[in-house]
Amino acid sequence: DKRVKIFHVDGRYFVKRAGKVDKYDLIFVNIPDPSTAFLNRFYTLEFFQEANDILEKEGVLATGVSSAVNYLGKEVGNYVGSIYQTMHSVFPHVIVSPGQTNYFFASNSFDTATFDIQALTKRYVERGVQSEYFSEHVFHTLLPPGRVKFIGDEIKSRKGLSVNTDTKPVTYFFNLMLWDKLTGSQLGRVLKLFERSHLKIILIPIFVFLVCRIVYIIVFRRSL
């Protein structure tokens, strides 16, 4: 399809530059969960602001992360909740789909992104979409109203979560906590110390250790 253009460039870099020439109806961030600092860059306040700058007035930003179907414990709730809080600090309208993967749809318009099955079915039929893998009836399976309400209420109830930023990657931190819980590791105890401590308090002993290490190496080499 000649209408499709592929740009081999870092996503953040592309979004920063795209606003100067183009506006988009939809931005779909199709990347893995923020399990690394690199991936976390696409779930931060700064990225959502940059994406918002290149969206049309009724445009939609969509992304998704792994979640849980029937129960959001502390780790999962904080994880997906931090993304919701961060997106909602940029976009007035954010909705989240239920399921093993939570899909987030954010917009400046309250009319574009919706989970209303009748509205979605009407749009699907009007556009004449033809697919052997999807039909308008699938909306009932993907978006049962009870499940939609459940995930929305659960995420909105996570008050006081910090916004995820480039310099304070809390969503990355919550992802680590979630994986620690899933694997039964004891790393979570150490991570919680980082959560309660100020960054400077953590960096000072690391800096002192590095200085001592450098001094030791210099002195040791001179003694040879």
Can you say where each PLM-predicted feature lies in the sequence?
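The AdoMet/dcAdoMet-binding core of the Class I SAM-like
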Residues: 1-84
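Soluble small-group transferase modules, centered on the S-adenosyl donor enzyme superfamily
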Residues: 2, 10-17, 21, 89-224
